[in-house]
Curated annotation (Swiss-Prot):
Keywords: Chaperone, Cytoplasm, Stress response. It comes from Mycoplasma genitalium (strain ATCC 33530 / DSM 19775 / NCTC 10195 / G37). This is Protein GrpE. It is found in: Cytoplasm. Homodimer.
Length: 217
């Protein structure tokens, strides 16, 4: 009985020893796993810390880039506004000039009748030199003609001065006919109807006879 009890005790001790050994092995395995996990966490933490440090180093560069972009955008915006304003000023100036030009030359449409009246008086005065009966009215005709001329000049209308012998100029003259003359070719022989300008614009071309330049004395 005593031997059996001893054997059982030994067996129990062996089993207990085996369990303890197995537990230690299990604890050691768990400890290793924990250490590996902690080591991995430490690596990841250090990596994140490095990333954070790199980001902190980049922040001033990013801030500088942001400031430079803001300044560039502000400069571009200012230049765009200046260009737009310049274009508006140009359009306003153009419209103003066009309006002034329109006002300046608006009277041109109303000048036909006054110019025709002047033509009639000039014709009458030219005949007055030849007809004694009409010559008595010369003073009155001249006064009316002068009054019309002053009114026209006050409104920017001037007669184009053309004399026989002048070179024909298509910019201010209209040729009625080419005629035989002692004058050189392309010279004005006679003015049939006076031409007029409104400021610097021709509103009526002078009607003239032009020399062929082939008449022999």
């Amino acid at each position: 009985m005593c031997e059996k009890s001893q054997t059982i005790k030994e067996l129990l001790n062996a089993i207990r020893t085996l369990v303890v050994k197995n537990n230690k092995a299990k604890v050691s395995m768990i400890e290793k796993e924990l250490l590996a996990f902690v080591s991995e966490l430490d690596k990841k933490f250090k990596q994140q810390l490095n990333n954070f440090n790199e980001l902190q180093q980049k922040i001033p560069l990013l801030q500088k880039a942001n400031e430079e972009f803001a300044l560039k955008f502000e400069r571009m915006q200012r230049e765009a506004q200046n260009q737009i304003q310049a274009k508006l000023d140009e359009l306003n100036l153009k419209n103003k000039k066009e309006l002034e030009q329109a006002k300046k030359y608006a009277i041109a449409k109303t000048l036909d009748q006054p110019l025709n009246i002047i033509d009639q008086f000039e014709i009458a005065l030219s005949y007055a030199q030849k007809d004694p009966q009409v010559k008595n009215y010369t003073t009155g005709f001249t006064m009316v003609l002068d009054a019309f001329s002053r009114w026209l000049e006050a409104n920017g209308v001037t007669k184009i001065k053309i004399e026989p012998g002048m070179e024909f100029d298509e910019k201010i003259m209209s040729a009625l006919e080419l005629v035989d003359s002692n004058l050189a070719k392309n010279k004005v022989v006679r003015v049939s109807k006076s031409g007029y300008k409104l400021y610097d614009k021709v509103i009526r071309f002078a009607s003239v006879f032009v020399s062929k330049g082939n008449k022999k004395s």
